[in-house]
């Protein structure tokens, strides 16, 4: 029952945060198509709904080898410390750019964030900024005082969700 309620909350938060971002969202989704089923299968095997696929769309445009200026790597833009903490035991410390290892580490981190942040808006912002950084900013309930970049992240995420490629 909790999972059904959480999935409904995910959908409503994303639906209610729609902004005009359609052209970019469409191109991101097209680029992600070859990896979509594999990413969704991994997320679901880790106990997460398929909607978290859209984090990879927003974070990296599904580019496996992309590295941010902050050093975050791969599909889900996982930092090295986060990867090392949440990676599966069969993944080496150097597999951060591997599709499966990056996705599994991200999924495990998301599950950790679900326990810390009860509403979806804050969870998505915490994923982008880091849970500890979000808490340092003060109000995690509304994520007050966050940069424009992080605030627009939720807009990108929600728009990509609204243009979702049908899953199963």
What residue ranges belong to the model's regions?
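Catalytic glycan-binding domains that act on GlcNAc-containing polysaccharides
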Residues: 26-168
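Classical Sec-dependent N-terminal signal peptides that target proteins to the secretory pathway
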Residues: 1-25
């Amino acid at each position: 029952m909790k999972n059904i309620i959480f999935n409904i909350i995910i959908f409503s938060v994303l639906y209610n945060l729609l902004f005009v971002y359609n052209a970019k969202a469409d191109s991101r989704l097209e680029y992600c198509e070859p990896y979509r089923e594999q990413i969704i299968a991994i997320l679901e095997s880790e106990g997460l709904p398929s909607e978290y696929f859209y984090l990879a769309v927003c974070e990296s445009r599904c580019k496996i080898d992309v590295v941010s200026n902050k050093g975050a790597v791969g599909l889900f833009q996982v930092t090295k410390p986060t990867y090392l903490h949440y990676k599966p035991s069969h993944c080496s410390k150097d597999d951060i750019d591997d599709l499966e290892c990056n996705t599994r580490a991200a999924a495990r981190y998301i599950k950790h964030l679900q326990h810390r942040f009860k509403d979806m808006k804050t969870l998505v912002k915490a994923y982008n900024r880091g849970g500890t950084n979000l808490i340092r900013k003060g109000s995690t309930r509304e994520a007050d005082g966050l940069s424009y970049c992080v605030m627009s992240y939720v807009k990108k995420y929600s728009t990509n969700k609204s243009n979702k490629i049908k899953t199963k």
